[in-house]
């Protein structure tokens, strides 16, 4: 159908348009060309002589503007005639066809990747559209060409970045030229391009709808009267597919819902339109049953809108779903005769509503627990994709209070329906919502939990109350967490995972609030460390977070050894981000599939739940320093104890720091700890304290001044131990008061530390209570030769064991595998095996060696050294 067959257009406007579109010469030349073409067709085709001549006469009679203003009867008669009818074309129509041909040429250039021709054709396209713009409308073909060309250009540029392939000079110049031209053109027509990309089919169909002629033309006056009548009409109706008007009445609600449910999951389903329909259905709903059914369906439809490329629910849709869910709970709370349970049978009769007996209840299939869980998950996904350092994250996080209110109301509703045994509602549903409530409070400080819970009860209707956490009975956050956890311990029969997660949440809460010994005892008595590998990934992440929090709690309590031991498994691995679900680690050698990467990102925790990794590293390195530096001094000449390593990560960092030729002032946390370690090893405990105190990260802890005071005391004590280990061989006696003045400790504290070292056989000395001095025993330290001899003996022993294992493997454990000639028996032979050289299992050994390398090793070497002494 020609694009110029428009209805409701006056002859005046048509004549004005014609004067602008084509000249008199075109009008005069067009008709002879048509006649000549008809004569040629008459000579070639003898069968259609009459029809051709008649059509030629008809075409010659109608010229000018009247040729384009045909009524329906003319168009019908022409369509029923011969298909060879020629239509006189205006200049505008010709230019439009030229525009389409140029756009087609650009598409052909895209297929062969010929950017030179694409650039030339795009210039031609811009010149052609400039003439068509005189009518005031932008051709949609032009908008489509710009959008498609821009997409193709971006795709080409992306491929060039991934797999660089050198273009020839012509293509390269053409691509650069098109890039500049497209940038300018898209900027001028950005609004139209966005409309085209939003819905391409609808955008292009709108043009076709504009050019289609109506079947009946009305005079301009009658059309104006119709518009006025439409303006006066106060009613409205929704037009569905095929132009049918949808009538929304209370009686038709169930039928409309049935139609929407049947179309769920199908392709080409407009969910936005379905939501609008259901919003109108809710307005006309007359009974609680209808409202409940509509709300259940509309919430499910909103959740379906997040499928596809979108990874999380938009804030607008989430707020709408949250509001509708709150409305659903309000309807269920006021209409107690209707309940929503998972085990209910659906109502199949759409013609009538169900009747509820007096005092009875009617069950509607659904799950309010699943809805509130989905709201929680969607909020978490949204927080995962928002930059946490922006105001948008804070604004989005404020929605958590509304979600918490709905979780509590859902818990109250599940408590109510769980009391009715006839509904057969499983206990698991109530446990799920209680667990959700616990997961929203366990990681928060007590003050925040108290405010959150108080505001929640203010939003809950006064007539509602809970049997698990009655209104006003929970005085503080600790009581709330204990009540929720104890309920899950009792009512999770057969749900080991839920019980384990509840225990981890309680341990985390206790550790967060500095109850170290209770958190430690619960962790040890639960034996979760033995079975955690069989749990799901989310539970393993929670276990890692709890373990880290227990370690931080031990550090705040001044228990350095316990803190380092607890944090060793997480911090020593170098994968803190991955283990705590606070970031995706870049795998250098392992190939990660897109699905694995997507799942890893889905497990990430929102930023407000993160544990500060810099603080965690600082605590771990500080504890390692306080343990490793005295150990370095103790193992100066003992190769046996040197094998003991507390933290490989710390030692690797310290060795790297010592290899540096020039060491500047500390810039980060790690540099501060390394330089403090170096100062502590040299006995400069005051300088080490200054380095540790200058770390800014301590300010993030609850009581930073107490933490710094505790660290000062620990550094003083470990500095004293390091000094005694290092300089003990050079003293005969040492006054306690001198040590007290050197390390700014009381005499009693120094005496206690020295006594502990002597009792643990770390120091070969005696404490004289009368003179308040330390008397060192001489001759117990190994010389350099003795240390090398012991090292050689250890290596020889290891070589013998390796040879024996190799021989046993080859001989498959036969009886004569270890027989040797010349009396050189095995471990019990003349040479005593490993025991003969060092007083081991097969030889004669002296008194057992003491820990710390302060006594002899026994055997021949020990006897020789002892005789000299």
Swiss-Prot record:
Boundaries of every PCI domain copy: 607-781
Compositional bias per record (Acidic residues), positions renumbered to this chain: 14-55
GO terms, biological process: formation of cytoplasmic translation initiation complex
Principal subcellular localisation of the protein: cytoplasm
Signal peptide region: none
Domain of life: Eukaryota
Pfam families (alphabetical): eIF-3c_N, PCI
GO cellular component, as recorded: eukaryotic 43S preinitiation complex; eukaryotic 48S preinitiation complex; eukaryotic translation initiation factor 3 complex, eIF3e; eukaryotic translation initiation factor 3 complex, eIF3m
Cellular localisation: Cytoplasm
Annotated segments matching region Disordered: 1-92, 182-242, 803-869
Molecular-function annotations in GO: RNA binding; translation initiation factor activity; translation initiation factor binding
Composition-biased stretches (Basic and acidic residues): 185-203
UniProt KW keywords: Cytoplasm, Initiation factor, Protein biosynthesis
Listed PROSITE patterns: PCI
Segments forming a coiled coil: none
Compositionally biased region (Gly residues): 823-843
Subunit relationships: Component of the eukaryotic translation initiation factor 3 (eIF-3) complex.
HAMAP family: eIF3c (MF_03002)
PANTHER family documented for this protein: EUKARYOTIC TRANSLATION INITATION FACTOR 3, SUBUNIT 8 EIF3S8 -RELATED (PTHR13937), EUKARYOTIC TRANSLATION INITIATION FACTOR 3 SUBUNIT C-RELATED (PTHR13937:SF0)
Family according to the record: Belongs to the eIF-3 subunit C family.
Function: Component of the eukaryotic translation initiation factor 3 (eIF-3) complex, which is involved in protein synthesis of a specialized repertoire of mRNAs and, together with other initiation factors, stimulates binding of mRNA and methionyl-tRNAi to the 40S ribosome. The eIF-3 complex specifically targets and initiates translation of a subset of mRNAs involved in cell proliferation.
Name listed for the protein in its UniProt record: Eukaryotic translation initiation factor 3 subunit C
Organism of this sequence: Botryotinia fuckeliana (strain B05.10)
């Amino acid at each position: 159908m020609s694009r110029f067959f428009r209805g409701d257009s006056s002859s005046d406007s048509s004549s004005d348009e014609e004067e602008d579109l084509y000249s008199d010469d075109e009008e005069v030349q067009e008709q002879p060309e048509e006649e000549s073409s008809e004569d040629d067709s008459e000579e070639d085709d003898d069968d259609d002589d009459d029809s051709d001549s008649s059509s030629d006469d008809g075409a010659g009679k109608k010229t000018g503007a009247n040729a384009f203003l045909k009524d329906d009867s003319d168009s019908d008669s022409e369509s029923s005639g011969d298909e060879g009818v020629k239509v006189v074309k205006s200049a505008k129509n010709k230019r439009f066809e030229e525009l389409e041909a140029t756009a087609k040429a650009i598409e052909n250039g895209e297929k062969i990747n010929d950017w030179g021709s694409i650039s030339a054709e795009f210039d031609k396209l811009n010149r052609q559209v400039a003439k068509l713009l005189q009518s005031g409308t932008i051709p949609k073909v032009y908008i489509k060409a710009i959008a498609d060309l821009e997409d193709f250009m971006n795709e080409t540029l992306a491929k060039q970045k991934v797999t660089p392939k050198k273009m020839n000079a012509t293509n390269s110049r053409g691509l650069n030229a098109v890039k500049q031209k497209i940038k300018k053109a898209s900027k001028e027509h950005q609004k139209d391009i966005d409309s085209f990309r939003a819905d391409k089919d609808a955008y292009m169909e709108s043009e076709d709808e504009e050019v289609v002629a109506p079947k009946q033309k009305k005079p301009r006056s009658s059309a104006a009267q119709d518009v006025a009548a439409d303006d006066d009409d106060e009613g409205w109706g929704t037009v569905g597919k095929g132009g049918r008007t949808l009538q929304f009445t209370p009686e038709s609600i169930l039928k409309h819902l049935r139609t929407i449910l049947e179309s769920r999951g199908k392709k080409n389903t407009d969910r936005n339109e379905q939501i609008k329909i259901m919003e109108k259905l809710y307005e006309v709903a007359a009974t609680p049953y209808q409202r409940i059914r509509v709300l259940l369906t509309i919430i499910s439809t909103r959740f379906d809108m997040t499928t596809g490329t979108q990874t999380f629910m938009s804030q607008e849709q989430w707020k709408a779903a949250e509001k509708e869910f709150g409305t659903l709970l309000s309807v269920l709370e006021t209409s107690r005769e209707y309940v929503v349970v998972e085990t209910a049978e659906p109502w199949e009769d759409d013609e009538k509503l169900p009747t509820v007996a007096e005092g009875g209840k009617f069950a509607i299939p659904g799950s309010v627990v699943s809805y509130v869980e989905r709201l929680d998950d969607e909020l978490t996904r949204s927080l995962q994709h928002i930059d946490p350092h922006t105001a948008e994250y804070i604004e989005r996080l404020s929605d958590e209070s509304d979600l918490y209110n709905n979780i509590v109301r859902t818990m109250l509703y599940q408590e109510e329906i769980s009391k009715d045994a006839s509904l057969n509602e499983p206990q698991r549903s109530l446990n799920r919502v209680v667990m959700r409530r616990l997961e929203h409070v366990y990681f928060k400080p007590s003050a925040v939990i108290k405010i959150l819970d108080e505001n929640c009860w203010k939003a809950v209707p006064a007539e509602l109350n809970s049997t698990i956490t009655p209104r006003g009975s929970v005085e503080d956050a600790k009581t709330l967490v204990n009540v929720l956890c104890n309920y899950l311990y009792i009512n999770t029969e057969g749900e080991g995972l839920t019980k384990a997660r509840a225990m981890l949440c309680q341990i985390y809460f206790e550790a967060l609030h500095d109850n170290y010994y209770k958190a430690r005892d619960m962790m040890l008595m639960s034996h979760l460390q033995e079975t955690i590998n069989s749990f799901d990934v989310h539970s393993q992440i929670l276990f890692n977070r709890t373990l880290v929090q227990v370690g931080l709690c031990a550090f705040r309590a001044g228990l350095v050894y316990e803190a380092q031991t607890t944090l060793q498994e997480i911090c020593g691995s170098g994968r803190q981000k991955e283990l705590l679900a606070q970031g995706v680690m870049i795998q250098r050698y392992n190939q990660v599939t897109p699905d694995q990467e997507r799942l890893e990102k889905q497990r990430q925790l929102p930023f407000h739940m993160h544990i500060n990794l810099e603080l965690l590293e600082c605590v771990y390195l500080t504890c390692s320093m306080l343990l490793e530096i005295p150990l370095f001094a103790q193992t100066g000449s003992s190769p046996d104890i040197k094998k003991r390593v507390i933290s490989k990560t710390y030692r690797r960092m310290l060795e790297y720091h010592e290899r540096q030729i020039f060491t500047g002032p500390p810039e980060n946390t790690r540099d501060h700890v390394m330089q403090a370690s170096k100062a502590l090893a040299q006995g400069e405990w005051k300088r080490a304290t200054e380095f540790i105190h200058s770390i800014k990260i301590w300010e993030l802890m609850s009581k930073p001044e107490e933490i710094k005071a505790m660290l000062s005391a620990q550094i003083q004590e470990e500095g004293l131990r390091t000094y005694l280990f290092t300089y003990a061989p050079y003293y005969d006696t040492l006054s306690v008061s001198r040590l007290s003045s050197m390390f700014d400790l009381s005499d009693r504290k120094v005496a206690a530390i020295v006594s502990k070292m002597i009792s643990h056989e770390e120091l070969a000395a005696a404490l004289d209570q009368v003179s308040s001095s330390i008397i060192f025993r001489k001759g117990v330290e190994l010389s350099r030769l003795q240390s090398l001899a012991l090292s050689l003996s250890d290596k020889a022993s290891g070589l013998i064991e390796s040879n024996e294992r190799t021989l046993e493997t080859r001989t498959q454990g036969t009886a004569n595998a270890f027989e040797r000639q010349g009396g050189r028996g095995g471990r019990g032979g003349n040479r005593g095996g490993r025991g003969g050289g060092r007083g081991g299992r097969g030889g004669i050994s002296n008194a057992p060696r003491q820990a710390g390398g302060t006594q002899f090793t026994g055997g021949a070497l020990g006897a020789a050294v002892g005789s000299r002494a």
